[in-house]
């Protein structure tokens, strides 16, 4: 297994993982309401491409959650390549699609179809949420509000009450975004 994950890092460290993992900021505490700072029960920490590759390489199951940030980065083809590489290593790969991720409903479906991600790997929120508790790694790429747990219980949040993809229930969650600031695209 170490050879498999090392191979993934060697093959993609410069091309793929540098695109995906290169823009992490400093570690910070995350509060239970999804905002930065305050009372915490989970700690956010930066990881480098090697640590990310090892987490993904040792996983049995990975759910990729694309968002508007993936669209802006035009990374859908790179994301598909990552999924294919993980599948070659025996990892079960799925894509979780929030109905309003991106700039319009269906935006992520269109981008992933353009990148030739098999439609059978795309799962809508209602179907995939029950699976997150059994997922080894949830990989969130450029999604903010559609995974923010503040929508569940922070009545002061502008997204309070919005259904979210429950990535926080996965064993590990990797969030790829440009900064640690909160953001609603």
Walk through the language-model features, giving the residues of each.
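Structured cytosolic domains appended to multi-pass membrane proteins
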Residues: 38-185
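Membrane-embedded alpha-helical bundles that constitute the cytochrome b-like, heme-associated redox core
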Residues: 31-34
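Single conserved hydrophobic/aromatic residue that forms the stacking wall/gate
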Residues: 1-12
């Amino acid at each position: 297994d170490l050879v498999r994950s090392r191979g993934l890092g060697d093959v993609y460290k410069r091309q793929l993982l540098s695109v995906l993992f290169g823009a992490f900021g400093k570690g910070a505490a995350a509060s239970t309401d999804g905002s930065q700072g305050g009372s915490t029960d989970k700690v956010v920490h930066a990881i480098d491409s090697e640590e990310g590759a090892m987490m993904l390489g040792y996983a049995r199951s990975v759910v990729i959650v694309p968002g508007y940030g993936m669209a802006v980065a035009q990374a859908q083809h790179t994301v598909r390549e990552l999924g294919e590489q993980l599948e070659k290593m025996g990892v079960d790969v799925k894509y979780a699609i929030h109905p309003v991720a991106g700039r319009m409903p269906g935006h992520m479906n269109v981008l992933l179809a353009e990148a030739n991600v098999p439609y059978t790997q795309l799962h809508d929120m209602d179907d995939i949420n029950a699976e997150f508790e059994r997922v080894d790694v949830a990989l969130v790429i450029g999604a903010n509000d559609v995974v923010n747990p503040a929508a569940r219980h922070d009545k002061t949040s502008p997204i309070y009450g919005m259904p979210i993809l429950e990535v926080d229930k996965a064993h590990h969650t990797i969030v790829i975004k440009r900064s640690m600031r909160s953001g609603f695209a």
